[in-house]
A protein has these predicted regions:
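Short small-residue beta-strand/loop micro-motif enriched in glycine and branched aliphatics
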Residues: 55-59, 116-118, 142
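C-terminal domain-tail junction helix/linker
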Residues: 5-12, 21, 111-113, 135-190
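Residue-level detector of anion-binding/catalytic polar loops
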Residues: 83, 114
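RNase H-like two-metal-ion nuclease catalytic core shared by retroviral integrases
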Residues: 89-91, 95-108, 115-138, 153-158, ...
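Active-site beta-loop-alpha junctions of metal-dependent nucleic acid enzymes
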Residues: 41-42, 58-82
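Mobile-element integrase/transposase regions
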Residues: 1-49, 55, 71
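Residues immediately flanking
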Residues: 27, 51, 63, 91
Length: 190
């Protein structure tokens, strides 16, 4: 029946049990800033979101290569206070390739991070990363007038800080990612 079909295609929602159990990653090509010519090289937004807490990490990098993905991973590992066990992405070439020579895959292996991938041509299975990119586009990029690429990077840092410490998230009982992490690591404080 029609109802059975809809229920089968409905998303299976889940939340991981602890911080770092799985981080969802994705990449998006950013639009040009007002005043830039169409020949200007595009920049790319890299995001990582912790499944348990919804803590967001983001960076703007010059290209969508395995080396930029590796650089972003190293930035996340430097900033992240908990161990990341799995990194879940689509099958983009920035994340997947020959494991013996691919910079991002080598960095994951060195950090003992298991890579997990979406089924081919099903980006919706990486919904948390897809959704956070949509949020970034709608609440940060479309609402801010950037006067330079450096200004855009600065505003991204501010937005990520707001997202992690002020914005409540329905998927984690209207807590902020910071509150979710504090509840996990310091339950006696609440």
């Amino acid at each position: 029946t029609e109802l059975e079909k809809r229920l089968k295609t409905q998303a299976r929602r889940y939340n991981k049990e602890y911080p770092g159990e799985m981080v969802h990653g994705d990449t998006k090509r950013l639009p040009l800033i007002t005043g830039e010519t169409t020949t200007a090289k595009r920049e790319y937004l890299f995001v990582a979101i912790d499944d348990y807490s919804r803590e967001l990490y983001a960076a703007i990098l010059p290209d969508k290569t395995q080396h930029s993905a590796q650089r972003f991973l190293k930035q996340v590992l430097t900033e992240c206070p908990y161990t990341i066990e799995q990194w879940y992405t689509d099958n983009g070439t920035e994340y997947k390739g020959d494991s013996a020579h691919h910079a991002f895959m080598i960095a994951c292996a060195a950090a003992k991070i298991e890579q997990r991938f979406t089924k081919v041509k099903t980006p919706q299975t990486n919904g948390k990363a897809e959704r956070v990119i949509r949020t970034l586009v709608e609440m940060w990029h479309e609402k801010t007038q950037f006067n330079s690429r450096a200004h855009r990077k600065q505003e991204l840092i501010r937005f990520v800080n707001w997202y992690n410490t002020v914005k409540p998230h329905k998927g984690i009982n209207n807590r902020t990612p910071m509150e979710q992490l504090i509840t996990y690591f310091y339950p006696e404080q609440l």
